[in-house]
Amino acid sequence: MDFDAKKIDAMNINKPLLPASLKGGAGAIIVDPPWNIQQSGNFGAINHYNLMTLEQIRALPVGSLCAENAHCWLWVTNATMEYGFEILRIWGFTPRSIFTWFKPRLGLGVYLRGMTEHILLGSKGKAPVKVKNQPNFGVFPVQEHSHKPEEIYNIVERVSPGPYLELFARRPRYGWAAWGEEITSDIAIPGFPVPKYSDTLIKDFQKKTGGV
């Protein structure tokens, strides 16, 4: 067991631990789940990171990480889009729109070869839309596996109110809190442990629990 796991055991907390920057919950959250649907084989995501079942993704307490009025941006593939709408609703969000990322490279596919990926926008409460002139598609280059376009963060910041949180993040971004297996996480989610938590979160948790 590593240092962080000794300080915060996500299997033994009953509500999310959030930093001061997310007091009241996130105003906008990006979620990029490691779907296990059509991700086997030599070129599938199974070769890059641990995958999650639909049941595990549904169980994520995304709604409780967000403010009363918030946006959720959920990444889906063509194969998982139908489940994405269902999961948004389970998390407490109403699906509102789809943003499509066009990739200038021929991808994989069972029937047709994929050149797109999508991010579903859902809302709860009365979260405002900050601008009304954002198109619902963009053409961005493909980078390493599962590296999403940096432009997406700019779009979210332009459209949605903060503060901002990303789940399954793979790299930190200024002004955003993040959680995932590949980074130092700024939050802790009950039942979903990750390898490393930020020093700030650990200290806050120790103060609340009287830990050393």
Regions found by a protein language model. Give the residues of each.
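Class I S-adenosyl-L-methionine-dependent methyltransferase catalytic core
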Residues: M1-V212
